């Protein structure tokens, strides 16, 4: 799995394992029953199927009480960026990883929501700190 290019799914699967190894509670959002089984096997505490769940934000809030501390968007889609901020608790952070073809996508939080909930939106480029990543993955038994 440690190739020069990882697919969106593989990146998400690694993220679930890293987050779990770091003691975080993971809610995975994807589509399909096969993904549910895999995400839970990799360490996700909860799995939400976006093709079946009518109100994802309400479900995330129900599970977390106030919303997620952080949302990492791996999907390269408008919908993922539009819905991500709605999953966050006050002071939460959205991390942009998936890079859509469209260059004009803006995370879907109105400025008032950004200000009142004190949300942060940050970008992340994967592929840096490779040695540290591999070292941590081996130590935490993420990659077996």
Show where each model-derived region lies:
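Local beta-strand N-terminus motif with an aromatic residue
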Residues: 44, 65-69
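Mid-domain Rossmann-like dinucleotide-binding core that forms the NAD(H)/NADP(H) cofactor-binding site
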Residues: 1-53
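N-terminal Rossmann-like NAD(P) cofactor-binding module of classical short-chain dehydrogenase/reductase
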Residues: 69-72, 95
């Amino acid at each position: 799995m440690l190739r020069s290019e990882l697919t969106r799914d593989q990146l998400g699967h690694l993220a679930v394992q890293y987050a779990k190894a770091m003691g975080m509670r993971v809610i995975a959002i994807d589509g399909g029953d096969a993904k549910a089984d895999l995400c839970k096997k990799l360490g996700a505490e909860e799995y939400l199927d976006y093709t079946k769940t009518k109100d994802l934000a309400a479900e995330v809030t129900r599970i977390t009480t106030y919303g997620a501390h952080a949302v990492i968007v791996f999907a390269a889609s408008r919908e993922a960026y539009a819905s991500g901020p709605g999953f966050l608790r006050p002071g939460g952070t959205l991390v942009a990883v998936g890079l859509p073809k469209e260059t004009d996508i803006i995370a879907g939080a109105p400025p008032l929501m950004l200000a009142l909930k004190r949300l942060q939106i940050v970008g992340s480029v994967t592929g840096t700190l490779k040695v540290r990543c591999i070292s941590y993955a081996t130590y935490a038994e993420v990659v077996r």
